[in-house]
Amino acid sequence: MSRPHGIPLPSAHRSSDDSTESMSACDDDEQGQPRPREGARQPTEAERVRTLVENNASVSLTLPGARDHGPGYWEPAARTVTPEGDVVLLVPWDSPTARAAACAQDDGPSCVMEITDVAPVAVRQRIRGRARLAGRLTAVRDDERARYERLLAERHPGHSPAYAEADRPAWMLVRLETDEVSVDDLWGAGRAAPAAVGAAEPDPVARHEAELLQHLHTAHGDQVRGLADLLGERGAAAGPAVREVVREVVREVVPLALDRFGLRLRCTAEGGRTFDVRFDFPEPVNGTGELRYAMHTLFAAAAG
């Protein structure tokens, strides 16, 4: 069985807090997050945005004149993407978002939804990416309600616009008609057409990623470290920037991200230098069963 090789991810930029530097073994990017090399299998911008919208990343909504009532007061309880690329949100009925949508005339007020993706395992530079969707906020018409409720139920079973308890408000469906979509994350920075986001599928691993990464970190730390130990083999044939880093003793290895294409680790060397490395699966996985087999194969190959 061939041994997997990690892909040290390139970036010539060091952040002002000196927290993360990545190795220039592949295509250099003058600044920003570590990027995969040209030609590597990776999700499109639209797929990455769709994944962020429909999973557990933190969301904030910006509306003209809306007051901030504190964290969690009017965050959407659930959200999904329509085939047209709009975003349907389930929000508290007494929230600024619901009031703005209910009072909307014609095109509705401008609205910006910002999504922040935070690593579920504690690492330096914990924010993994951000997405921004800008457009107009409108109420969901009565003749559209059943359709959007079905879309939400498919992605978020158990959430219902009619749900209410004594200590929490009832919910309202609103829609963000998107005009502009952008993303900046571990894969790169770019834009996506709303229609492309509507046609994309979220990453099948994303829904379980947080618990899987936490499990890898707490229960399989030695195996994760075994993958990082392969960096020495990679560095021997790489450029001087890679060799400079892999010569240092890696003192900490943390699983940073997991998707259908592979596993990304964040490594911290003895001198405090931090860099990322990816281990790609032989083929993209389509669910937890295939993921379990891919991870077993990866660890077995690393063990020799």
Feature roles, as predicted:
Residues 1-31, 149-304:
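C-terminal edge-of-domain segments
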Residues 3-8, 25-102:
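An N-terminal domain-cap segment
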Residues 62-66, 116, 266-270:
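A generic structural motif
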Residues 91-93, 115-117, 137, 175-180, ...:
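Short, structured patches in soluble enzyme cores that scaffold and shape functional sites
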Residues 93-157, 271-275:
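Short, structured beta-strand-loop surface elements
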